[in-house]
Amino acid sequence: MNGTLYCVSTGPGDPELLTLKAARIIRQCPVIAVSARSTAASDGRQCIAYKIAAAAVPETGQKELLALHMPMTRERELLERTHREAARTLIETLRQGKDIAWLNLGDVSIYSSSTYGAKAVREAGVAVEMVSGVPSFCAAAAPLGRSLAEGGEELQV
């Protein structure tokens, strides 16, 4: 039986803003994946999303780590190639029956690199779940004591 890929939002940077659901999934998954500068585990441990999760869920450091090379570039060919490579790595691990928590800075529904890998994993017939988090624009408004929208006002994201 295949594992499940959980694309997990780690929020805007404060480990205390990691959701209870995200923490539970990180605890239950034997494998943690992160988008990194390279496939070296040391690069994966330097990712902000990994550091947030490790601060909130200390057992994160004892899990198998997949550092998925996701370069910050607009070079389409390079992006497509690295997305395919990441998807292959994920699918191979998921087909071993292991669940994976792919950590994402911010929220998985807003400019998340896991979107591309999740699509390929779904197309391979493997289950994917997206775990939402606290978006940075909401986290920024809270300490200011500001409402982002009231009454008949519109809020556009």
Please give the residue ranges for each predicted region.
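Glycine-rich phosphate/diphosphate-binding loops that line cofactor/substrate pockets in enzymes
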Residues: 1, 25-28, 88-98
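Residue-level preference for the first positions of well-ordered beta-strands
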Residues: 4-7, 97-101
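Glycine-rich, flexible N-terminal cofactor/catalytic loop recognition
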Residues: 1-66
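Short, basic, glycine/proline-bearing loop/turn elements
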Residues: 1-10, 74-76, 151-155
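Class I SAM-dependent methyltransferase SAM-binding "motif I" and its flanking Rossmann-like core
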Residues: 106-157
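Short glycine-rich anion-binding loops that position phosphate/pyrophosphate groups of nucleotides
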Residues: 12-15, 38-39, 71-73, 105-109
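Glycine-rich, highly charged phosphate/nucleotide-binding loops
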Residues: 79-91
